[in-house]
Amino acid sequence: MPSDPPTRPADGLRRAPDADIVAGPSRHPVTVAADEVDAFFTTLGFRAHQTPEIEDALHTFDLLGVPADHPTRSPAHTYYAADGRLLRTHTTSSVLRVLRREPGAARRRILVGGPCYRRTTPGPRFVTQFHQMEAAAVGPEVGLPDAIGTSLALLDEMLGDDHGARLRSRALPYVSPGFCVDVPCAPSGCDGCTLCGGRGFVELVSGGVFTAAVARAAGVPDGSTATSVAVSLERLLAIRHGLADIRPFLSPDPHALAALA
């Protein structure tokens, strides 16, 4: 099957509802961060693809091995349309879509990104619309160390090499093993901090090795492995600016956004 022509995920971010509100030459801070992440992965040979914000349960849940009774499938957590389609809840569904366009490719490096949506009460750490970018690599030589190394190199690029990141395992339905990378929460020394919830660290990156079932669903051939690395842009920006809240980056106030650009 021919693939769609690659496009920059930052283009999709500029079309997000909050992405064009700053008048004049200023650029939205989320767009700036997206372009920086895009540039980082481009230097590593990843190709960016545009993907839809309107998804289906097949790519969002079923093919990723999300159990039928998982809370994220509930309308209490996900925005559903009357026809059963839904607003994208994470970018891994987009990764799956792009990989399935060229089944059987032994080696690939792709990048997707854009707005994601979840039903929640907006707060310092969780909001109804947020932005993710996710890179996936496929190849016989690809493995978990590559995904971890790429994650740490990305944080070096975005935050400097003194970010103090820690690595821990994380259970996700579609990866095994899975991991995440946390960074120290700078704003308030943890006591009463609304970004880290008093834990002292904030999760910025998650990823892992796709399970055999997910790899087959994505069209990854036998002998190749697929990994993914996803980063939260608003959380990344909050750490970069020393804020204990991601909501300022979704503000409709152009003056407040200009100060964060």
Each model region followed by its residue ranges:
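TRNA-recognition modules of translation machinery and tRNA-sensing kinases, especially anticodon-binding
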Residues: 2-261
